[in-house]
């Protein structure tokens, strides 16, 4: 039965390619496509889960802003000062969004939620990376789009976001910080509602969705993950500004398919790290990326990222367990 389901999923993923430029990595596929257009074109109830890290400034991944980032001119990207001889990576200025841009962000995620709702099977989960500044806005908008808010996954990680002294007045106010140093990353866990009268067990039988997969040791998936920052070797493989570590993504991708069957989708696949995580643990995935530079980067990066051994694969070294 499981082999038949896997074979059916592999056939289904072929039909999701449509007429888009694409490449394959193992059993997974990445398309050069705009996710709004693509998700609107594919049949309803096509994918089992979504794991993604979307562009929160909306405009920070516009082509002109990416060019400014590459040239070191900033734009929406804040180019932090170096310290201890180390250069800090550019970060998008979420606090730079004015009311009009926040309204644009709201429309963006409302429309995105609607096409995601269309693409997901009933009971399909969405794992969506966010940040403390905008998560309350984005999660609320996704609820308006029709998705259920289930809970929040908290990734404990020490970042370089926040904690800065007042800009251009660092010497005048040396004992002040504009914001707390960020030490966690919120991920929204949402779900497409089950059909009326359907129980979780019914949904699992009919759609292979509705629940979360337990950890390999049999324990339940937890809503806190102690994480590392993305290691240097992974960043060398995939120079993407919001690259998440494989040790984190593999845990999330594992949880997203309760029976270990189905198709994971990353609509903002960037360097392909979610697809790489899916390949590493042996599940099917499909990613879409509209920026040709990142699309081509993922062609090179995904096989390398998928082949990495992380702490979660080493016996006795599950470094990010709550136990």
Question: Which residues fall in each region the model found?
Answer:
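Core catalytic lobe of class I
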Residues: 1-308, 312, 320-323
């Amino acid at each position: 039965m499981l082999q038949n389901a896997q074979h059916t999923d592999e056939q289904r993923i072929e039909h999701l390619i449509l007429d888009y430029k694409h490449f394959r990595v193992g059993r997974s596929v990445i398309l050069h496509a705009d996710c709004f257009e693509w998700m609107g074109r594919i049949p309803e109830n096509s994918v089992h889960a979504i794991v993604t890290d979307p562009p929160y400034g909306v405009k920070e991944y516009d082509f002109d802003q990416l060019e400014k980032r590459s040239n070191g001119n900033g734009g929406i990207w804040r180019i932090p000062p170096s310290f201890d001889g180390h250069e800090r990576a550019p970060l998008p200025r979420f606090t730079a969004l004015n009311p009009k841009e926040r309204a644009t962000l709201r429309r963006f995620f409302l429309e995105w939620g609607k096409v995601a709702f269309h693409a997901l099977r009933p009971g399909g989960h969405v794992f969506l990376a966010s940040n403390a500044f905008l998560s309350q806005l984005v999660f609320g908008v996704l609820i308006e789009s029709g998705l259920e808010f289930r809970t929040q996954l908290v990734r404990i990680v020490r970042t370089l976001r926040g904690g800065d002294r007042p800009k251009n007045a660092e010497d005048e106010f040396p004992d002040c910080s504009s914001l707390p140093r960020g030490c966690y990353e919120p991920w929204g866990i949402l779900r497409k509602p089950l059909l009326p009268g359907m129980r979780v067990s019914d949904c699992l039988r009919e759609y292979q969705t509705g629940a979360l997969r337990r950890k390999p040791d049999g324990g339940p998936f937890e809503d806190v993950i102690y994480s590392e920052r993305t290691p240097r070797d992974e960043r060398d493989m995939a120079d993407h500004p919001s690259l998440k570590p494989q040790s984190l993504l593999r845990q999330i991708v594992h949880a997203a398919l309760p029976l270990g069957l189905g198709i994971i989708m990353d609509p903002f696949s960037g360097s392909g790290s979610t697809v790489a995580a899916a390949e590493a643990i042996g599940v099917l995935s499909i990613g879409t990326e509209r920026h040709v530079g990142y699309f081509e980067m993922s062609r090179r990066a995904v096989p390398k990222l998928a082949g990495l051994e992380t702490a979660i694969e080493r016996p006795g070294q599950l470094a990010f367990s709550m136990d």
